[in-house]
Amino acid sequence: MDQRHHPQQPLLLVSTAGDPAVKVDIINGLSGYEFSRLRLIASVGSTVVWTNRTAVTQVVQLNDRVIRLAPGGNDGATALTRFSESGQILGRLRSNRAASITFFITEEFKL
């Protein structure tokens, strides 16, 4: 088919899976317990799936929210949170105060 007569349309990606989900694991790192990621960009309405991959209970502090995760492999080792407004959120591990994760929350999801 001759492409000169059919201009290309921009590709539009549409998700039918619902809200975008972001996965963050707590792992045994080089400097102790840490997050599997340091920085994330997500949109308002995104869900974060937190999973504790360590053998001990972990507590995540997100601004004014606290998430308690049971040791990996046990009930309660995974938790879900959702971003309801835009901005920057800093998360810290109580078991390693040097471990942090920063979320940049935007109004819309960008690929």
State where each predicted segment sits:
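Intrinsic-disorder-associated, low-complexity terminal segments enriched in Asp/Asn/His/Tyr and depleted
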Residues: 2-6
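Extracellular/periplasmic metallocenter environments
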Residues: 7-18, 71-111
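N-terminal edge beta-strand
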Residues: 17-47
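Short, solvent-exposed loop/turn positions at domain surfaces
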Residues: 34-36, 63, 77
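Asparagine-centered strand-capping/turn motif at beta-strand->loop junctions
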Residues: 51-54
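Short, surface-exposed beta-strand/strand-loop-strand elements in extracellular ectodomains
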Residues: 59-65
